[in-house]
């Protein structure tokens, strides 16, 4: 039951926070920076595949192994760094015209988002049971 609670909390909070950030708060910035690189319409299958795998990774590597809320949030920072820095640095390296201004903004968002949803997932799931000897 803990896995289900954590997964649902991570998934719901991630979608809500990402929609607010990408669809409202940072929409103009992303549109301006990406210009013609940005698709007119979101490819729903690709977005769904990303969210499903990312929720699973956050739950498995940040939420479930954490003994405390702080540890879940810190592990979320690590997962966020790996995911968002890999994406941004790779794009910056290989896509001609990738805007350098996107790199710190998107990485910072990935850190905030992933750490936050890991903490939310941990709170929803509750602390793990103590190990039995």
Where do the PLM segments sit?
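Juxtamembrane/disordered regions of integral membrane proteins
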Residues: 1-133
